[in-house]
């Protein structure tokens, strides 16, 4: 099963050896002084136990990317993902001043759940500004919504671009 491209490896976090090995890999790099980790598509790491195919997304535009043409009901935010993230965070908490950033493309009400109770991501990336209209009122409303949804102690963040998006200068 590949979420994005056949050449990109997928790990089966349901296999009993995978998570302990990943946590050991994290410790390896933390012992060497890295300040933390940016975890790509952290909300998609855990797959459906039955490896069911995703259903078509009835709301997808005809020219949508293949990823957006399906509804990720079996691979996005699957039950158990928060437990895995908590274990990753516990490893980071064994070290001083380390952090974990999670790449999560979700609406605010779902995004903020990845802070946990201060025991999951230090910062789930907030990508909402990337797709908002470049309008001060719309952006202001969103900022109020996002900051109002942050859990106590949650660090806000504002992503305007990344390797998956066109540069901001070409979007505004």
Locations of the language-model features?
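Active-site and adjacent substrate-binding regions of carbohydrate-active enzymes
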Residues: 1-172
């Amino acid at each position: 099963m590949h979420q994005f491209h056949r050449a990109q490896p997928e790990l089966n976090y349901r296999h009993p050896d995978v998570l302990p090995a990943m946590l050991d890999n994290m410790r390896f790099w933390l012992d060497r002084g890295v300040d933390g980790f940016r975890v790509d598509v952290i909300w998609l790491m855990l797959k459906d136990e039955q490896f069911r195919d995703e259903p078509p997304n009835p709301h997808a535009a005809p020219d949508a990317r293949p990823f957006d043409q399906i509804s990720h009901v079996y691979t996005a935010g699957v039950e158990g993902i928060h437990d895995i993230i908590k274990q990753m965070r516990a490893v980071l908490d064994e070290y001083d001043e380390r952090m974990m950033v999670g790449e999560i493309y979700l609406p605010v009400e779902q995004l903020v759940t990845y802070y946990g109770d201060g025991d999951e991501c230090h910062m789930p990336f907030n990508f909402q500004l990337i797709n908002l209209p470049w309008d001060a009122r719309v952006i202001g409303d969103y900022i109020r919504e996002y900051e109002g949804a942050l859990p106590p102690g949650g660090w806000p963040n504002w992503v305007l671009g990344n390797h998956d998006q066109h540069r901001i200068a070409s979007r505004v």
